[in-house]
């Protein structure tokens, strides 16, 4: 990155950091983004250059930033002695821990995402893909898609649980995630005949149902 690119990136991070605070006061909208720029002593013109697509681009920048932090933290705890099941669990927990300090703002972001299912699925798929790859998955066949769809369901349903979790250290969420992963492992043990009846389409429908629940959350 050259000097100008570093400056550009620094300003984008500054806006994002401020926006995660301002979302709690103004909601997730254009006015909030403008207010965040003002709070960072930046003009609306500069804001337009930093995030030309407004809120949508801010959200994408947020998800990309979280992805980088998640992979960095996963790599810190990587061990060949950990089961794949536990690597998946750790990946989801690490991501939720990154969300913790901005929990209410994160809720706003995901409720907003639920209104645009296609974009939401794209982000869910990317998260699941990164977690699977970090766990050592190199599958390229039909299982490649099923694994990512199932993890998207596990992650999104766990996120919904986490939003309502008031227990210390999110213990309720951790128990919920363990149960969800166990359900997926049970699915993996079923015969190919049974699996064929539980298609990727049915998993996709489960995701749609959770997105509808997210959309109805009051923020």
Regions found by a protein language model. Give the residues of each.
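Key DNA-contact positions within bacterial/archaeal DNA-binding proteins
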Residues: 45
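Long, charge-rich low-complexity segments
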Residues: 190-219
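Amphipathic alpha-helical packing segments from all-alpha helical-bundle domains
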Residues: 115-137, 146-152, 156
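Short, amphipathic alpha-helix enriched in basic
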Residues: 2, 7-35, 39-42, 53-60, ...
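Hydrophobic alpha-helical connector segments
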Residues: 9, 73-105
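Hydrophobic/aromatic-rich alpha-helical bundle segments in the mid-to-C-terminal region
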Residues: 137-153, 157-199
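Amphipathic alpha-helical segments used for helix-helix packing
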Residues: 96-118, 125
